[in-house]
Swiss-Prot record:
Main localization, broad class: membrane
Tissues where the protein occurs: Detected in testis and liver. Detected in immature spermatocytes and in interstitial Leydig cells.
Compartment(s) where it occurs, according to its Swiss-Prot or TrEMBL record: Cell membrane; Basolateral cell membrane
Residues in the Cytoplasmic compartment per record: 1-24, 78-79, 93-98, 179-190, 265-295
Protein name: Aquaporin-9
Intramembrane segments: 80-92, 211-225
Activity modulation comment: Channel activity is inhibited by mercury ions and phloretin.
NCBIfam families given in the database record: MIP
Alphabetical list of PANTHER family matching this protein: AQUAPORIN OR AQUAGLYCEROPORIN RELATED, AQUAPORIN-9
Subunit structure comment from the entry: Homotetramer; each monomer provides an independent glycerol/water pore.
SUPFAM superfamilies per UniProt: Aquaporin-like
């Protein structure tokens, strides 16, 4: 029989358990974004601070994509695993999530990314201090700011960088919309995070040169703000011809375009009753409209 101690623990857990659905989803988005930033940015830190003895561009791309996968497995069933304001915006814009949830999701994502960046800084503090003789640099061969946020390649123009962010995020959302379209091929239940991780790898390997393939305003702006406060200074906002706003605005536009393109080219043309498509059980479609992500 359960002891009084077990009963007391259960009672405490019940009292602490959140009853509000939006509160649960907000915590989920915070934790998921935190996980993504800690594991993803740490994969960059390990490569940079070891001067590529413990990694390089391949391990960074795989590491960050895998961080997204892990974050999704933690959050998918609770909040849909957006972990990206651009994804949440697209979900709301196309009626797949209620607008009142948007500020809760986005606030949690930005806060989770900021705390995640602070955690990476703490983990690799000694390495950061040793890397450039105690200096925290934004540019140059000993720069470390790009461990936390993306920066443009020297050759890219401001319009080029903006288009780069729009296009990369457009592909992200276009394919995510396809994955969760029950009238299309779809993905086996439970494997969605893995396929999204593969998508992140493809995008990073093909569209990462120009400006780092952020595709996520929270992933970029919150860590950038942290670095400004932690010792790199506000040069993180002025470098690259004031590049900072591009990974914030570009993904929002790209996410909307990606969803719109999929709907216009594919989804709106589904027959109401397609004999070649078998309807999925309602259990498998539960809240499928909210499921999606990004880096």
């Amino acid at each position: 029989m359960p002891s009084e101690k077990d009963g007391a623990k259960k009672s405490l857990m019940q009292r602490l358990a959140l009853k509000s659905r939006i509160a649960k989803e907000t915590l989920s988005e915070f934790l998921g974004t935190f996980i993504m930033i800690v594991l993803g940015c740490s994969s960059i830190a390990q490569a940079v601070l070891s001067r590529e003895r413990f990694g390089g561009i391949i391990t960074i791309n795989i590491g960050f994509a895998s961080a997204v996968v892990m974050a999704l497995y933690v959050t998918f069933g609770i909040s849909g695993g957006h972990i990206n304001p651009a994804v949440s915006f697209a979900m709301c814009a196309f009626g797949r999530m209620e607008w009142f949830k948007f500020p809760f999701y986005v606030g949690a994502q930005f806060l989770g990314a900021f705390v995640g960046a602070a955690t990476v800084f703490g983990i690799y503090y000694d390495g950061l201090m040793a890397f450039a003789g105690g200096k925290l640099l934004v540019v140059g061969e000993n720069a470390t700011a790009f461990i936390f946020a993306t920066y443009p390649a020297p050759f890219i123009s401001t319009p080029g960088a903006f288009v780069d962010q729009v296009v990369s995020t457009m592909f992200l959302l276009l394919i995510v919309f396809a994955m969760f379209d029950s009238r299309n091929l779809g993905v086996p239940r439970g494997l969605e995070p893995v396929v999204i991780g593969l998508l992140i790898i493809v995008l990073s390997c093909s569209l990462g040169l120009n400006s780092g393939c952020a595709m996520n305003p929270a992933r970029d702006l919150s860590p950038r703000l942290f670095t400004a406060l932690a010792g790199w200074g506000f040069e993180v906002f002025t470098v690259g011809n004031n590049f900072w706003w591009i990974p914030v605005v570009g993904p929002m536009i790209g996410a909307f375009l990606g969803g719109l393109i999929y709907i216009l080219f594919i989804q709106m043309h589904h027959s109401k009753l397609d004999p070649d498509m078998k309807a999925e059980p309602s259990e498998n479609n539960l809240e499928k409209h909210e499921l999606s992500v990004i880096m």
